[in-house]
């Protein structure tokens, strides 16, 4: 059976993206993301794929799978699938965004790795928002740390059976 995990960074307001981009830079979160996902399958939506810089697309060291409703969509270096179930064929799969793909994958997930960024970013119309975890999830919260970028952040690890 496939272990499905979700991984994201969010502002304290729950915003994960604005205008097709991540509105902060946190090198420590990028390193954490790389450590968690390296060697595994990563699943993302088309907009997340498009938001990756061309020089790192596909993300190296991982099987990149793009979920798209467009049957003719091409993603050089990645597999394109039409359903989440088609993507869940590896022993460990990490969903990396965006908001719609997180919502589809949440019922399958048993792990969530979350970076909370302490940044004043009120919600606006059109923002991509983090999934809401219900009472079936149990988590461990890390201490607040300071990034080299000057932002404060902390890591959460959530699990459910």
From Swiss-Prot:
It catalyses: (6S)-5,6,7,8-tetrahydrofolate + NADP(+) = 7,8-dihydrofolate + NADPH + H(+). NADP(+) binds at residues 8-9, 16-21, 45-48, 67-70, 82, 96-101. Pathway: Cofactor biosynthesis; tetrahydrofolate biosynthesis; 5,6,7,8-tetrahydrofolate from 7,8-dihydrofolate: step 1/1. Its EC number is 1.5.1.3. This is Dihydrofolate reductase. Residues 1-160 form the DHFR domain. It comes from Mycobacterium tuberculosis (strain ATCC 25618 / H37Rv). The keyword NADP applies. GO terms for cellular component: cytosol. Belongs to the dihydrofolate reductase family. GO terms for molecular function: dihydrofolate reductase activity; NADP binding; NADP+ binding. It holds the Pfam family DHFR_1. Substrate binds at residues 7-9, 29, 34, 62, 102, 115. One of its GO terms (biological process) is one-carbon metabolic process. CDD domains: DHFR. The lineage of its organism: Bacteria, Bacillati, Actinomycetota, Actinomycetes, Mycobacteriales. Keywords: NADP, One-carbon metabolism, Oxidoreductase. InterPro entries: DHFR, DHFR-like_dom_sf, DHFR_CS, DHFR_dom. It comes from the Bacteria. Inhibited by isoniazid metabolites. The prodrug isoniazid is metabolized to isoniazid-NADP adducts that inhibit the enzyme at subnanomolar concentration. Key enzyme in folate metabolism. Catalyzes an essential reaction for de novo glycine and purine synthesis, and for DNA precursor synthesis. It is an enzyme of class 1 (oxidoreductase).
